[in-house]
Amino acid sequence: MDAIKKKMQAMKVDRENAQDLAEQMEQKLKDTETAKAKLEEEFNELQKKLTATENNYDTVNEQLQEANTKLENSEKQITQLESDVGGLQRRLTLLEEDYERSEEKLNSTTEKLEEASKAADESERNRKVLEGRSNSYEERIDELEKQLETAKNVATDADHKFDEAARKLAITEVDLERAETRLEAADAKVLELEEELTVVGANIKTLQVQNDQASQREDSYEETIRDLTKSLKDAENRATEAERQVVKLQKEVDRLEDELLAEKERYKAISDDLDQTFAEIAGY
């Protein structure tokens, strides 16, 4: 009878120990599942950050390419404007030279006109005095009159050319003003592009990458890409490590579940043994 009591006592202790162990295993399983859920959440967060980093990388790359394209277009426009201004300046110089030549020609024509007028007056006096002389003298008068008419026509043409030169000069001044306006607009566009590049740099800083000089030089852009690539690789490494941790924890959970199942079976066996012992005692 004492042996049975001792056996019952030992079985009771084993059952209590098994129950305590089962509770501990259940708690450990819960803790492990909590850690697993946390790691899975961190893994998902890393996946989101990885996706965001890739998207940010593509966005930054596109923004930098677009900024470089705009800057190149602005430089081409400025070069074209400078070429246009140079052409207008050359045209203005030619017009000024043409104007000077026209003015000289006008002065010369005016002098000739005065001389022709004087000659005509002199011829008129001579004609009155020498009237009746040979027809050759009259022809000379006609010739002088023709020369006078020619001189007047030359003076008129010179006036027209002077007016035309003045008109071209005015047009050139208007074109020059327009070119200056276009140049100012190009300068404003360059400033606008520089502001856009500054905004791009600020956006890149908010993405926690070192790309604050991406708008200035290509080597800074390449350095930023290297930083983004490194961050991407770090994120991939962290994601890989998280996957390994999840697999490891899953194995630990499976092992604990197996141990818990074994302890439950052991507990059931002890309970069955106790029930059988109680039944035997009751039979006595």
UniProtKB/Swiss-Prot annotation:
Top-rank taxon, per record: Eukaryota
Region span, Disordered: 1-27, 99-131
GO BP term, pick one: regulation of muscle contraction
Keywords: Allergen, Coiled coil, Muscle protein, Repeat
Record field: compositional bias (Basic and acidic residues): 102-131
One MF annotation (Gene Ontology) recorded for this entry: protein homodimerization activity
Residues spanning the signal sequence: none
Coiled coil region boundaries: 1-273
Matching Gene3D superfamilies: 1.20.5.170, 1.20.5.340
Assembly and binders: Homodimer.
PANTHER family: TROPOMYOSIN
Family that this chain belongs to: Belongs to the tropomyosin family.
Functional summary from the UniProt entry: Tropomyosin, in association with the troponin complex, plays a central role in the calcium dependent regulation of muscle contraction.
Domain comment quoted from the record: The molecule is in a coiled coil structure that is formed by 2 polypeptide chains. The sequence exhibits a prominent seven-residues periodicity.
Protein name (database record): Tropomyosin
Organism: Mimachlamys nobilis (Noble scallop)
